[in-house]
Amino acid sequence: MQGNQAVVDYMNELLSGELAARDQYFIHSRLYSEWGYTKLFERLNHEMEEETTHAEDFIRRILMLGGTPKMARAELNIGTDVVSCLKADLQTEYEVRDALKKGIKLCEEAQDYVTRDLMVAQLKDTEEDHAHWLEQQLRLIELIGEGNYYQSQL
């Protein structure tokens, strides 16, 4: 099936972001493991798997629309401690959210409602799961302090 070229091109941009998010979560999860924060490792490892699924969904759709997936990822923002990792991941999620909203608008203009629905589902996951959880963690650190938070993540 031949898809709208602007939609395919934009999906490749989104794919680049998903690949970067996956790799960033991968590195951060391994940092958490190295630092002994088992709960953070488990959560970020789960997020990495979800980002991999998002990337796979985009790859499948790009192929279905007759495009070629571009596997170059966007730049990573790697933290050096728990707080900077959480903040970097939250910033990445905000960027993904904004990009998905633009993509949804583009799909509506191109009348590609199947791709739009794919992006809407990923936007829901980004806002309600990923970004929300990261915001909660940063809020907890503010409320109970870093030491108490770190202890809760062992």
UniProtKB/Swiss-Prot annotation:
Residues 1-145 form the Ferritin-like diiron domain. The keyword Protein biosynthesis does not apply. GO terms for molecular function: ferric iron binding; ferroxidase activity; heme binding. It is found in: Cytoplasm. The keyword Oxidoreductase applies. Its EC number is 1.16.3.1. SUPFAM superfamilies: Ferritin-like. InterPro entries: Bacterioferritin, Ferritin-like, Ferritin-like_diiron, Ferritin-like_SF, Ferritin_DPS_dom. Its main location: cytoplasm. Keywords: Cytoplasm, Ion transport, Iron, Iron storage, Iron transport, Metal-binding, Oxidoreductase, Transport. GO terms for cellular component: cytosol. It is an enzyme of class 1 (oxidoreductase). It catalyses: 4 Fe(2+) + O2 + 4 H(+) = 4 Fe(3+) + 2 H2O; Fe(2+)(in) = Fe(2+)(out). NCBIfam families: bfr. Iron-storage protein. Its ferroxidase center binds Fe(2+), oxidizes it using dioxygen to Fe(3+), and participates in the subsequent Fe(3+) oxide mineral core formation within the central cavity of the BFR protein shell. Plays a role in protection against iron-mediated oxidative stress. This is Bacterial ferritin. It comes from Neisseria gonorrhoeae.
